[in-house]
A protein has these predicted regions:
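N-terminal targeting/anchoring "stem" of glycan-biosynthesis enzymes
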Residues: 2-40, 44, 51-67, 71-106, ...
Length: 571
């Protein structure tokens, strides 16, 4: 019986087939893993081959279904080929990670197996990129760079796959290696842009990595300032949200409309997706005039220092209409007209619960330890508005402290308005803390982790979590933190394996920093000669450790813990 399919039926078959193939892929992946655990090596290899063939056959089945009543288009054909390669590459990575955790020797063997695969001319960009990532996770950095060279040579236009090698290094906390990779990728991309004549377009497109989190959207501040400082204002930047992707905060994105244009059909008509991919700028790093690409944090410090040295004003201001609307909502929240308020946001695991369960981090804190500081601000005539999401632990009702996060007034609009209209912002290491500075609002950042990557805005102050060593039976010095993984990792597993644990800031330390920020805003901070000396000693240490100057360490905290400035003999 001849199978006839309408366009709707074909779409339905495509969806069903995708679900079926992904489900079967996951099943086979776990079957392979169990085979490995119970030493059924022959069964494991057979299952692995079956997994690869399954994906290829499903893709071919789709092609057959489409071609029964019409010729398949090139775009549809390439879609299925890409689907096959991406699922296969992802399965490779997941399988490798599982093996590596159990036995690093097995990881090395599997890495060598895939290195041989990469030598074949038909090896996909995804497989080469994923194998380079495997090499990085095993400390085989030279091999990773060699694979990157192969990737660039064979797939010069696949900028995204090249960049992902650097992202893998970044996720593993190998920031210097990530910058080396991004520098190589950037140099290749610029050569390619000139070779293809794309530089004449004077256009750039924002890559999907800019829309992953609200902090990424806020970091457009640094991206655009860098562009302005280097005289590239005539280069247009385009924004286009990929299908199936949702903005973390569309209201914040709309604030960039004076600097970023929405991609339209007229712009697209003369540009292939391939060329747009080449012209996409990623969130992770920014290329500088010296030829080096710097990670977003280090780039942020360099750009912001120059911006403030030239006495330039913030790019964004709360719009007049938004201010009127926001002030109306403030009154409904219980903040009288002409009253000042401070925003408070303390990171909790609920918003990224799934991620936190699989990757326990060091950036969360206890909201209860912030209440003494909040009460002190209320006693001084202010209001404290707690920001966050619906997963936050509820606050006990207190005069002047407003739990906006769990109120009916919570919205994307008010999130941005509150961050841009408060006197200052009290926060932890979270993307929301990057919104106030783009409106020129200073931040007092607490329980900061890791110490090696502070917020990069110079008007901010911060206090880090300290780290206790079970082996040494004491807290690590600042030098010991900054010159080891302890000062750069935001994941607990790296600390636990070294017998280390983070120590949260005390309520007294938090209150001290908050009042220090209030005094700073009011122009009432006076530093002694000894204070200046302590700060210089700490900043010199930070630069020596290849970190950067951004937010200043709280002076009260530095006085309390000045013993941690001692030179260490354990690193």
């Amino acid at each position: 019986m001849k199978l006839e399919t309408s366009l709707t039926d074909r779409d339905r078959l495509k969806k069903v087939g995708l679900i079926f193939s992904i489900g079967l892929t996951i099943f086979l992946f776990w079957f392979i893993l169990l085979s490995y655990v119970f030493a059924f090596k022959r069964l494991m290899l057979l299952s692995w081959l079956a997994l690869k063939r399954l994906i290829a056959r499903v893709a071919r089945l789709f092609l057959t279904l489409f071609s029964r009543d019409r010729k398949i288009s090139n775009s549809e054909g390439s879609f299925f080929v890409r689907m096959h390669k991406r699922i296969y590459a992802r399965a490779v990575v997941e399988f490798f990670n599982a093996l590596q955790i159990k036995n690093s020797q097995s990881g090395i063997k599997l890495l060598n197996f895939f290195i041989e695969k990469c030598k074949r001319l038909d090896a996909s960009a995804q497989i080469i990129s994923s194998t380079a990532g495997m090499a990085i996770s095993l400390g085989e950095n030279k091999e990773a760079l060699r694979l990157l060279s192969i990737l660039i040579e064979r797939y010069p236009s696949d900028v995204s796959a090249q960049q992902q090698v650097g992202v893998k290094a970044f996720i593993l906390g190998k920031y210097k290696l990530a910058e080396i990779i991004w520098t190589l990728c950037s140099a290749h991309r610029e050569d390619l842009i000139i070779k293809l004549g794309l530089d004449k377009l004077k256009a750039r497109f924002l890559a999907p990595s800019w829309y992953l989190a609200i902090g990424h959207i806020a970091h457009l501040d640094i991206y655009l300032k860098h562009k302005i400082l280097n005289g590239h204002v005539d280069h247009k930047t385009y924004f286009s949200l990929p299908a199936g992707m949702q903005l973390p905060n569309s209201n914040l994105m709309s604030y960039w409309s004076d600097y970023i244009s929405t991609l339209d059909k007229d712009t697209l008509k003369n540009l292939s997706p391939n060329k747009i991919g080449i012209l996409q700028d990623e969130f992770w790093s920014i290329p500088f005039e010296d030829g080096k690409s710097r990670m977003f944090s280090h780039a942020g410090s360099m750009v912001q220092q120059r911006w403030e040295a030239e006495e330039r004003t913030p790019l964004l201001n709360i719009k007049p209409a938004d201010r009127l609307r926001g002030e109306d909502t403030l009154r409904e929240l219980g903040v009288p007209a002409n009253s000042w308020f401070v925003c408070l946001h303390v990171r909790e695991p609920g918003f990224h619960l799934k991620w936190h369960k699989s990757h326990p981090g060091t950036r969360n804190a206890d909201i209860e330890t912030y209440l003494p500081a909040a009460r002190e601000l209320v006693a001084r005539g202010g209001y404290v508005i707690r920001l966050g999401d619906s997963s936050m632990r509820p606050l006990t009702k207190e005069k002047g402290i407003i739990d906006y996060a769990l109120s009916k007034y919570k919205s994307e609009f008010m999130d941005v308005f509150l961050c841009g209209a408060c006197r200052f912002f009290i926060g932890t290491n979270s993307g929301l803390g990057l919104i106030p500075p783009i409106f020129g609002i200073p931040c007092a950042m607490t329980n900061w982790s890791p110490i090696g990557l502070p917020q990069w805005y110079l008007k901010d102050v911060y206090i880090p979590k300290l780290i206790f060593s079970e082996r040494l039976s004491r807290n690590l010095t600042f030098e010991e933190m900054l010159f080891s993984e302890a000062g750069w990792s935001q994941f607990e597993k790296y600390l636990v394996k070294s017998g280390l644990q983070t120590i949260d800031n005390t309520p007294e330390e938090i209150t001290e920093l908050v009042l220090e920020m209030l005094d700073k805003i009011n122009g009432e901070v006076t530093l002694t000669d000894n204070d200046q000396k302590l700060r210089k000693t700490f900043n010199d240490l930070v630069l020596r450790a290849d970190s950067y100057i951004g937010a200043q360490l709280g002076m009260g905290f530095l006085r309390r813990h000045q013993a941690l400035l001692a030179t260490s003999t354990t690193i």
